[in-house]
Amino acid sequence: SNLGQMLVKICKDDSVPLVNIVRKPEQVELLKSLGAEHVCNTNDPDFMKDLVKALIETGATLGFDATGGGNNGELPGQILSAMEMAANATAKEYSRYGSDTYKQVYIYGGLDRQPTLLKRAFGMSWGLGGWLLTPMIGKIGMERFQQMRERVASEIKTTFASKYVQEISFEEMLQPEIVK
């Protein structure tokens, strides 16, 4: 997705480790061509193993899911479980309640309308919730929001650029035969 491509660029620019999860081999190649280090394909037989390895290497304990399900509704739970496995791989002691590392997945889109399924293999220190831009802006305040807007404006042709198959004018957009 365009958002995934933007995330690769901004995280690389800001030295923030990022783990990307995609569904197709061509998406893996695209993100890697942009400089992504960790790209896991949900359709790969080693998906969970690759995801745990990437999470160990990055230390990531926060995830964002655009689908709200994916992988038959299991993707958010798979992410949490992989985070738990990564936390336990470096844990100093065992607890029957799981690691004490807090893991969070935010669903910010509803591309997959089927139920989100959680197979509880991620201990007791976790969260799953929704994420929307408008409430986040209220929490960070107008000054920080303005800084973010300025960054997007200054990087609109680079970091935040989108690729389109075709551009049409506003007048053309109003013609049903062109929009189809």
Regions found by a protein language model. Give the residues of each.
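A short, hydrophobic/aromatic-rich structural module that often spans a beta strand
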Residues: 30, 126-139
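Aromatic/hydrophobic pocket-lining residues that form π-stacking "cages" and hydrophobic walls in ligand
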Residues: 7, 51, 152
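Short beta->alpha linker loops
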Residues: 22-26, 42-46, 67-70, 168-172
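Mid-domain Rossmann-like dinucleotide-binding core that forms the NAD(H)/NADP(H) cofactor-binding site
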Residues: 1-45
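Glycine-rich cofactor phosphate-binding loops and adjacent beta1-alpha1 units
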Residues: 34, 38-129
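C-terminal hydrophobic helical "lid"/dimerization subdomain
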Residues: 80, 86-91, 133-180
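Terminal peptide-recognition signature
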Residues: 11, 31, 63, 79, ...
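Residue-level detector of flexible, active-site-proximal loop/helix-junction positions
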Residues: 25, 46, 112, 132-137
